[in-house]
Amino acid sequence: MATVTAALVKELRERTGAGMMECKKALVEANADIELAIENMRKSGAAKAAKKAGNVAAEGAIIIKEENGSAVLLEVNCQTDFVAKDGNFTAFAQEVAAAALASKATVEELQAQFEEARVALVAKIGENINIRRVQYVEGTAIASYRHGEKIGVVVAGEGDAETLKHVAMHVAASKPEYVNPEDVPADVVAKEKEVQVEIAMNEGKPAEIAEKMVVGRMKKFTGEISLTGQAFIMEPKKTVGEMLKEKGASVATFVRLEVGEGIEKAEGLSFAEEVALAQKG
């Protein structure tokens, strides 16, 4: 039987990123054949990744990349904030984002393209990893802003870089849903109007006064959920629309992504319990 040397273990660790004991075990089982050990580890890594696939991945990072009037926002998820800061995880996310910007691939295409790398990463770090969302923005003038790793915004429009950057920061903080009040869909407006009419009637106001109240409340509602109607966070006495007009700027579109939006975590588990389960997995 061939001897498993420390040098072989070291080489296998460098090539796979796996732990020392895992590398030694793989070499023993492969009779010190490093290529066979790597093949076997890849196979067992795939099995490990499959076991991790059911674990909720609601942490992670938003990556933004820009080039020549194009930008990509990518969300890659993991299970814990600790792994979200891991160099291997961030390198993987950056690689996927770079490929996305170059190809404008769909999330399904990116998932297929990077599945082998994802499986290897799951085996290495021991957490479920998921390429979840990708969105693209095109424009003559683009600005982006990331709040830590968790929130990413890209704004496209007309104007100087500083103004659009400030708008991106505003979007990160204030979460507008539409660019302008008139962009709010008719069904959303109608649903809110029903609510406001009922509230006014329940307050016992005369019909004429109730109607005026509803008009005012609806104007406030559409303003609060649209970018240009919101109070600008850096100058709250002005709306974003007023600030843009003063600067001779405009916004055509924006995209805001936040890590874990819409993902339901398992109920009844504390963070420590989730980590313990991940370690057992």
Swiss-Prot record:
Q: Name one GO molecular function term.
A: translation elongation factor activity
Q: Can you tell which superkingdom this protein's organism belongs to?
A: Bacteria
Where is this protein found? Cytoplasm
Listed InterPro entries? EF-Ts_dimer_sf, Transl_elong_EFTs/EF1B, Transl_elong_EFTs/EF1B_dimer, Transl_elong_Ts_CS, UBA-like_sf
Keyword list (alphabetical) reads: Cytoplasm, Elongation factor, Protein biosynthesis
Instruction: Cite the residue spans of the region called Involved in Mg(2+) ion dislocation from EF-Tu.
Output: 80-83
Cite the NCBIfam families for this sequence: tsf
Family statement drawn from the similarity comment of this UniProt entry = Belongs to the EF-Ts family.
The entry's function note states: Associates with the EF-Tu.GDP complex and induces the exchange of GDP to GTP. It remains bound to the aminoacyl-tRNA.EF-Tu.GTP complex up to the GTP hydrolysis stage on the ribosome.
Q: What is this protein called?
A: Elongation factor Ts
Source organism of the structure: Vibrio parahaemolyticus serotype O3:K6 (strain RIMD 2210633)
Specify the taxonomic lineage.
Bacteria, Pseudomonadati, Pseudomonadota, Gammaproteobacteria, Vibrionales
